[in-house]
């Protein structure tokens, strides 16, 4: 499987704070056709606020999903595979080792997105799917919330906030009252 070839099928693996997702697409238009879409809840961000590390259990769940996704992409004759990782892999003390494990398994370099890039990726998804969108795009993940302005097929200011579903759960220790305060 090669990176960057145009045309044909391609896959994207998103390694997030709560889930790992594979989406396979068929190229051919501004909005590529989705052929396959699967998400595995790995919980990489679980406990990250307190420990500063990705747990061994969550890493194993994520790596098992990635191994499976690689086989699926190869079986579907995907011509390229792109792997991105977000805030959990970016901020964890053992994030670089985890990324190295992914690269060893797949042979594909992992792009660790910063907060602005996460916001841009969400905006590109909207730009590909809607005619002349105008407004604010929000992407709520397990470890962060990204907001970005879009209009006239252009990206505006984008920000990433440390408020995701897993982070809120961890920081509030499961208390609804504490979560509301945060």
What does each model-identified segment do?
Residues 1-17, 23-137, 148-182:
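Nucleotide/phosphate-binding catalytic cleft detector across ATP-hydrolyzing
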Residues 142-144:
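Active-site-adjacent helix-turn-beta-strand microarchitecture at beta-sheet edges
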